[in-house]
C-alpha cells in the first residue's frame, strides 16, 4: 500500500515528462507491429468508417471470422507480453531486495497513472480560453482529443475538453488506480495494455471493425465499474464546486 501511495504522489508531483520512456509507448509499438503482421500494410480508405462511402464495403463471412480471430490473437499476445514482462520486473525486483521491490513497485504505479498529465494538458485549454486565444485553445485541445479541432468555436473547444477530461478521469486515473489497488502494478499494466489496444484498433473502420472488436469489447467490460465510479465522483465534485 505504501508503494501504491508513493506512486500516486510521484504522478501528482511529476506527471509524465516527454523525455521519460513510458510503458504505453512500448505497448503501442507492440500493437502496431502485430497489427501490421496480422492485417498487413494499411491501405488508403481503411481508416474510413465501415458505413462510409468507399469504406469497408461488404466482407464475406470467412473474412469476418478470420479478422475476428486475428483480433483475439492480438489481445492474447499483447496481454501475455505485458503480464510476463511486468511480472518479471516486479517479482525480480522484490527477489533482489525488498527495498528494490518497493522502489520498482512505486515507479510502475507512477507510470500507470495519468492524473497530473490530464490536469496539465486540460489547464492549457482553460488558460487559452481565458485569454480569448481561440487558436491556442484549439491547438491545446487537439493534444488531448482525437478529432479535428480546426473548426471548433470557443464553446466547441470547451465541450471537447470537458468530454475528454471526463473520459480520461475514468481510464487514466480511476480505473488504473482501482486495478492497481486490486492486483498490484502487474494488473495495472494489463489494464493499460487493454486501454491502449482500444485506443489504437477499437474503431469502426474498414480495417478495424472486426479486427479490433475483441479489444474494444474487453475495454468496455473492464471499464464498466470504473466508469460508474468516475461518474459519481464527477457529479459529487461538480456539486461541491457549484458547477
Where are these regions (language model features)?
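Glycine-rich phosphate/dinucleotide-binding loop and adjoining beta-alpha-beta core of small-molecule
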Residues: 199
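Hydrophobic alpha-helical transmembrane segments
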Residues: 1-189, 202-243
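Substrate/ligand-engaging "lid" and interaction regions
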Residues: 195
